[in-house]
Amino acid sequence: MNNIWWQTKGQGNVHLVLLHGWGLNAEVWRCIDEELSSHFTLHLVDLPGFGRSRGFGALSLADMAEAVLQQAPDKAIWLGWSLGGLVASQIALTHPERVQALVTVASSPCFSARDEWPGIKPDVLAGFQQQLSDDFQRTVERFLALQTMGTETARQDARALKKTVLALPMPEVDVLNGGLEILKTVDLRQPLQNVSMPFLRLYGYLDGLVPRKVVPMLDKLWPHSESYIFAKAAHAPFISHPVEFCHLLVALKQRVLVVSES
């Protein structure tokens, strides 16, 4: 059986699992893991086929979620960034008893643009898939550059993301393609209407991949959830605004503890 790479840090009284985005790995959290591990028992995970979780091919969203769950604590706050937000959401839908709260970061339940739904144009995602076959390192770098565009620290943030990618062997092309296929096809807008645990959605005002127009639409569709927009962030608010980001998670932890004690 293939193993998921998993690292646990800290001894907080609430578990927090962090799931990274497409093309990346758990090293992306190093900018905040020290701070978070002083408040939580922190779980850093490389998604199947990414980073140190080798030996996996392209997986469906459901299979990716099940693979990650195998090594997870019984109960935790699940936080997913971008593609990781879909994985965390899938776990909240299929195993709600194991999710104390769901946090999605710069993530959309439907990344692909649809009728009356803002998102990434399907032909752009298909283009990325095609380009992966031609020059996959350059394609990944282009995708990373898109994630930080427009912020005051764009160049520095893009360098941080690139360093994360290059720190470990690149994922296989079929794994990257599989991740893009999930972004292109999955739509969890309706299913997530039914989750009952605390649900926090974090966005960057300048995000070029998850348009801010989706925020009020999802506020209306999911009135039980809360949203927060980082005014000067793009697709990676935890890199550009680490202090503010951690503060929101610590505040969520306090709410989760109140709920679990009542």
UniProtKB/Swiss-Prot annotation:
The active site is at S82 (nucleophile), D207, H235. One of its GO terms (molecular function) is pimelyl-[acyl-carrier protein] methyl ester esterase activity. GO terms for cellular component: cytoplasm. Pathway: Cofactor biosynthesis; biotin biosynthesis. Substrate binds at W22, S82, L83, F143, L144, A145, L146, Q147, H235. Keywords: Biotin biosynthesis, Cytoplasm, Hydrolase, Serine esterase. Its EC number is 3.1.1.85. GO terms for biological process: biotin biosynthetic process. Residues 15-242 form the AB hydrolase-1 domain. It catalyses: 6-carboxyhexanoyl-[ACP] methyl ester + H2O = 6-carboxyhexanoyl-[ACP] + methanol + H(+). It comes from the Bacteria. InterPro entries: AB_hydrolase_1, AB_hydrolase_fold, BioH, Carboxylesterase_BioH. It is found in: Cytoplasm. Its main location: cytoplasm. Belongs to the AB hydrolase superfamily. Carboxylesterase BioH family. Monomer. The physiological role of BioH is to remove the methyl group introduced by BioC when the pimeloyl moiety is complete. It allows to synthesize pimeloyl-ACP via the fatty acid synthetic pathway through the hydrolysis of the ester bonds of pimeloyl-ACP esters. NCBIfam families: bioH, PRK10349.1. This is Pimeloyl-[acyl-carrier protein] methyl ester esterase. It comes from Shigella flexneri. The lineage of its organism: Bacteria, Pseudomonadati, Pseudomonadota, Gammaproteobacteria, Enterobacterales.
